[in-house]
């Protein structure tokens, strides 16, 4: 009871795009979350779309199977740049069209990183609209939720509401309880997911089996310090007053 059996797995979730330099990919690359469209991460020397990227992959002949996801942050950047604001109806309509193109060209679904910029500025209705379009085409939804710490349970509830509304198949990526003050929330987090599955929702989650974590350093900065992307971060780090505010927030 309360134990799970699984085949041996490597790291089945990779965000980085493989370098398309003619080499076979490393054997630990089991899955690939690659954004398809119009943002900095989406572009390369030979591709702008999922169709272009697939053609490049086929030329490289990778050694592993790859699954492509349309990244919400890249969809957002392609329409809104790094603007720290809510999306307008026109913004959402354009993102939806770009997502549908990516899905039609072979993306397996949509992924979100709602603790990262610019996704941190999105409202639930924006993500819901895109997930609805994804569900219509049979796509999958993989999410880095809005919180893995102080608001973990509320973030899980947002995912559950989205899955109930759309019927989409979903995965909570890297389920964790970040921060000692939140460690006690794990049983309740798992209970909510199990209850949703018993209800009939097609929802799963994964946890990596190690204690450390790795991500972009800007994740530890207060939202105001990183709003506007890397250029804004550098300006704030160079400004003595802003730097003192950042240090105070990190020490709090």
Pin down the residues of each PLM region.
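Single conserved hydrophobic/aromatic residue that forms the stacking wall/gate
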Residues: 1-13
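Divalent-metal coordination cores built from histidine and acidic residues
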Residues: 11-108, 201-203
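Short acidic, glycine/serine/threonine-rich loops at helix termini
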Residues: 19-27, 77-83, 122-124, 153-157, ...
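Active-site glycine- and acidic-residue-rich loops that bind
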Residues: 47, 86-93, 117-122, 149-153, ...
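Alpha-helical scaffolding segments of alpha/beta enzyme cores, especially the outer helices
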Residues: 52-55, 97, 125-136, 157-161, ...
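Active-site beta-loop-alpha junctions enriched in small/polar residues
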Residues: 71-73, 113-117, 146-148, 175-178, ...
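Divalent metal-binding pocket/active-site signature
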Residues: 101, 107-159
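Hard-cation-handling environments
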Residues: 186-252
């Amino acid at each position: 009871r309360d134990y799970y059996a699984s085949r041996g797995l490597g790291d089945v979730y990779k965000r980085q795009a493989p370098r398309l330099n003619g080499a076979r990919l490393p054997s630990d690359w089991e899955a690939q979350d690659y954004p398809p469209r119009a943002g900095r991460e989406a572009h390369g020397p030979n591709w702008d779309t999922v169709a272009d990227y697939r053609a490049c992959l086929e030329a490289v002949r990778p050694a592993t199977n790859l699954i492509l996801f349309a990244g919400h942050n890249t969809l957002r950047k392609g329409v809104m740049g790094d603007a720290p604001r809510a999306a307008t109806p026109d913004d959402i309509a354009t993102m939806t069209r770009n997502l549908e193109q990516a899905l039609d060209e072979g993306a397996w679904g949509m992924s979100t990183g709602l603790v990262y910029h610019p996704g941190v500025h999105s409202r639930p209705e924006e993500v819901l609209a895109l997930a609805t379009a994804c569900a219509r085409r049979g796509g999958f939804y993989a999410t880095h939720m809005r919180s893995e710490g102080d608001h973990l349970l509320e973030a899980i509830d947002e995912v559950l509401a989205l899955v109930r509304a759309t019927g989409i198949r979903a995965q909570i990526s890297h389920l964790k309880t970040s921060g000692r003050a939140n460690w006690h929330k794990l049983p309740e987090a798992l209970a909510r997911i199990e209850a949703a599955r018993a209800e009939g929702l097609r929802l799963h989650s994964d946890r990596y089996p190690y204690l450390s974590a790795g991500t972009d350093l800007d994740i530890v900065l207060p939202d105001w310090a990183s709003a506007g992307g890397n250029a804004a971060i550098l300006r704030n780090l160079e400004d003595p007053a802003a730097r003192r505010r950042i240090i105070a927030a990190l020490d709090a």
